[in-house]
């Protein structure tokens, strides 16, 4: 359990320095969370930080289940 909290702390610290990096480490490059965080960071640094910290704290990647839908 302590290593999980330590990893979360490091991800939040990275998210404060460079918001998309913390989200990338948790969810990957092609996730919706990463794309939203990247867009918010480009539009404004502070909204990117707020969203990144929210995503890292509120969404648990182990319990987070994605639903994939076919496009065609």
Curated annotation (Swiss-Prot):
Compartmental location: Membrane
Keywords associated with the record: Membrane, Transmembrane, Transmembrane helix
Name listed for the protein in its UniProt record: Hydrophobic protein OSR8
Family under the similarity heading: Belongs to the UPF0057 (PMP3) family.
Region forming the signal peptide: none
Membrane topology value: Multi-pass membrane protein
Coiled-coil stretches: none
Transmembrane segments: 9-29, 39-59
Organism name: Oryza sativa subsp. japonica (Rice)
Name of the coding gene: OSR8
Pfam families: Pmp3 (PF01679)
InterPro entries, A to Z: PMP3
Cellular component terms per the entry's GO annotation: membrane
């Amino acid at each position: 359990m302590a290593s999980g909290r330590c990893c979360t702390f490091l991800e939040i610290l990275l998210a404060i320095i460079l918001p998309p990096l913390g989200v990338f480490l948790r969810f990957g490059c092609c996730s919706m969370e990463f794309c939203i965080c990247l867009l918010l960071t480009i539009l404004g640094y502070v909204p990117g930080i707020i969203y990144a910290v929210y995503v890292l704290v509120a969404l648990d990647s182990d319990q987070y289940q994605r639903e994939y839908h076919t496009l065609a």
